[in-house]
Amino acid sequence: MTAPSTPSASSVVPSGADTSPHVAAIHEKILIVDFGSQVTQLIARRVREEGVYSEIVPFQKAEAAFAEMKPKAVILSGGPASVLDADAPAAPMAILEAGVPVLGICYGEQTLAKQLGGTVEAGHHREFGRATIEITDDCALFDGVWQKGGTYDVWMSHGDRVTKLPDGFRGVAKAPGSPISVIADDKRKFYATQFHLEVVHTPDGAKILRNFVRKVAGLTGDWTMRAFREEAIEKIRAQVGTGKVICGLSGGVDSAVAAVLIHEAIGDQLTCVFVDHGMLRKDEAKTVVDLFRHHYNIPLVHVDASETFLGALSGVTDPEQKRKIIGKLFIDVFDAEAKVVGGADYLAQGTLYPDVIESVSFTGGPSVTIKSHHNVGGLPERMNMKLVEPLRELFKDEVRALGRELGLPEIFVGRHPFPGPGLAIRCPGEITAEKLDILRNADAVYIDQIRKAGLYDAIWQAFAVLLPVKTVGVMGDGRTYEYVVGLRAVTSTDGMTADYYPFDMAFLGATATRIINEVKGVNRVVYDVTSKPPGTIEWE
């Protein structure tokens, strides 16, 4: 469950607050200069998978970040601009003259080549999607991965192309739409690829990036969750001192890990507030209370506000309206309980690194809102409290790894994402207590089936939806007129795109039979085979 653990940083960071994470100076670091690519975050994640801390900064702030961060290497991301434009984004020359290894990707290759004296031209043939490159010479990036003379699949997304190399560079690969697909300056340790090595569609991309990190930059990889845990505890103690911290606990991964980490640092100076809005999964409230109050002995205030929330949602059918009502009411209830606790100086939030990245956009302009995100964005200003955000340096997969390091049960650490508004957005149309009970029970049966089949960890997210329609059925000798349950399961790496999970029909048939037999009020079950895009993962 994301609320209140994964707020959008643009809405929660107070005016003037520091928006960059800080990592101990002892760690090896790679700076990623962002030119606006939609997949820049993947570069950072791939680097961290190699045990090296990476940080993304927009190109406008790259020179200052480089001076402060003192990275061991730099990666230039892709981007939507053309280096041929008069106002094209560029890498700071101070970075290119600093003597550290540099890797350019797509736009990063083009700007590196152009800035160092090469030529870039508009391509006669654009390359978008899967492409094949031929390796024309050996290169440190290819060591142990690709051989001279071989051809390999990659993912391209470009219009411009490098046509003349800067002094000191050599071309080491070619493709039909980009005759100089990979460039190398071995003396300066400058390398660049026209293709996107960070995406899964380039099968050997991770290995090539590993070669840059390990063999070119010579980094050993000291970024571990064990080290992070120790450093985070010291930072929390230094920040909080003898102050009191209040943490909104949702039952989701982020808030759970943040709470346990903070409690390990400051003990009973932390109080958690768990607001049950009545739209949680089956037995979820009991599980949260048992784990945090009885197992970890964390001071916990459990508020059953289900009647308040359901009353406010009565008659509401618009999904955006539901989200806004739940978000505002959550703030009201949390604020009231925080005042009862009293004396808190700090508000703990499970802000993650992607939230921090999103707060500094490439263009500085607005983006289209597909769905509003439920968070506690109004709390810091409203409660006049300082923020404690111990996870702000981490990606989601790192949070899970930290949770395991802290000893959190796998049922918490490995659970599928759950939306802040909970079952409210899995119950299209008006929400009632009866509908929520039906949905809660159907969802529990579905997840139980998935776990028994050993499929839970192979699926990014799975859940049931209660449709706002009834259909005719036959049970025994009688006619029924009951609800339809939709089942959804998707595979994904980051939630940005997703494919439906291809269950076999025997599994779906057995699951449908169990739901209809065990859940009163349901007489039909359907399976959603929509990918994202065009659909979204959630129904509302």
Curated annotation (Swiss-Prot):
Q: Which GO terms describe its cellular component?
A: cytosol
Superkingdom, taxonomy of origin = Bacteria
Q: Which reaction does it catalyse?
A: XMP + L-glutamine + ATP + H2O = GMP + L-glutamate + AMP + diphosphate + 2 H(+)
Q: Which UniProt keywords apply?
A: ATP-binding, Glutamine amidotransferase, GMP biosynthesis, Ligase, Nucleotide-binding, Purine biosynthesis
Q: Where is the active site?
A: C106, H196, E198
**Is Transcription regulation among this UniProt entry's keywords?**
no
Give the PROSITE patterns listed for this entry.
Answer: GATASE_TYPE_1, GMPS_ATP_PPASE
- Keyword Ligase on entry: yes
User: What's the Enzyme Commission number for this chain?
Assistant: 6.3.5.2
- Signal peptide feature range: none
Q: Name one GO molecular function term.
A: ATP binding
To which pathway does this protein belong?
A: Purine metabolism; GMP biosynthesis; GMP from XMP (L-Gln route): step 1/1
Look at the named UniProt entry and state the broad enzyme category this protein falls under.
ligase
Name the positions where ATP binds: S250, G251, G252, V253, D254, S255, A256
Residue limits of the GMPS ATP-PPase domain?
223-415
The residues covered by the Glutamine amidotransferase type-1 domain are 29-222
Q: Read off the HAMAP family from this record.
A: GMP_synthase
Assembly with partners or alone: Homodimer.
Q: What does this protein do?
A: Catalyzes the synthesis of GMP from XMP.
Protein name as it appears in the record: GMP synthase [glutamine-hydrolyzing]
What is the organism of origin for this protein? Rhodopseudomonas palustris (strain HaA2)
Organism classification, top ranks? Bacteria, Pseudomonadati, Pseudomonadota, Alphaproteobacteria, Hyphomicrobiales
